[in-house]
Amino acid sequence: MATELTWHDVLADEKQQPYFINTLHTVAGERQSGITVYPPQKDVFNAFRFTELGDVKVVILGQDPYHGPGQAHGLAFSVRPGIAPPPSLVNMYKELEASIPGFVRPAHGYLESWARQGVLLLNTVLTVRAGQAHSHASLGWETFTDKVISLINQHREGVVFLLWGSHAQKKGAIIDPQRHHILKAPHPSPLSAHRGFFGCNHFALTNQWLEQHGEKTIDWTPVLPAESE
């Protein structure tokens, strides 16, 4: 049963913590000094904007945002309309083609339609310097996103967690497998997808789990906002 609690309810105290204020201050300082930081400030918390706590059915964990121009917009693995899908997302599409009947790979990589169905697309680090992967990994974001995972664990039941790669799988320690459904596989990156991401069947297994527990399944075909109106 969906909780009435919102992200605002459960995160208000966390956002007053000194570490969190310091994280925001550091990121703001870099932007003000002329360093390009992705995603743009208005998009940093989009994962929470598009998927409210009470609507979370699935969590897909990423690591840090894409660090190329115009890509990152606050949803893990997703890119803005007009930007070519990056290699990891292309491999996710390949797995969807292989496991979801009727899935046709789109030309875009914008996953907002997943988020609006209850798929929380959460990077564990929410900002990055342009061209420098993991450049904000030690700023405190992971303390915050670990708290987010623990709050989902606490306030929701029957959430499917898709943990791809060793970084995401370490977060499994925060999740109670008696309350939630955890699926693990290698990361969809070209470096590791052939080691077991392809063939993991996670998208189909997620829908199977949701259906068995009386939840609406996810339409995994990403739809651009204009197409869904």
Swiss-Prot record:
Keywords from the named record: Cytoplasm, DNA damage, DNA repair, Hydrolase
E.C. designation(s): 3.2.2.27
Catalytic residues identified in the record: D64 (proton acceptor)
GO CC annotation: cytoplasm
Domain of life (superkingdom): Bacteria
Family matches, as CDD domains: UDG-F1-like
Pfam family, one: UDG
SMART domains documented for this protein: UDG, UreE_C
Signal peptide: none
Gene Ontology MF term list: uracil DNA N-glycosylase activity
GO BP annotations, alphabetical order: base-excision repair, AP site formation via deaminated base removal
Catalytic function, reaction form: Hydrolyzes single-stranded DNA or mismatched double-stranded DNA and polynucleotides, releasing free uracil
Protein localization: Cytoplasm
Function: Excises uracil residues from the DNA which can arise as a result of misincorporation of dUMP residues by DNA polymerase or due to deamination of cytosine.
NCBIfam families the record matches: PRK05254.1-1, PRK05254.1-2, PRK05254.1-4, PRK05254.1-5, ung
HAMAP family assigned to the protein according to its UniProt record, in alphabetical order: UDG
Family designation: Belongs to the uracil-DNA glycosylase (UDG) superfamily. UNG family.
Subunit structure: Monomer.
Alphabetized PANTHER family for the sequence: URACIL-DNA GLYCOSYLASE
Protein name: Uracil-DNA glycosylase
Lineage of the species this protein comes from: Bacteria, Pseudomonadati, Pseudomonadota, Gammaproteobacteria, Enterobacterales
Designated gene of the protein: ung
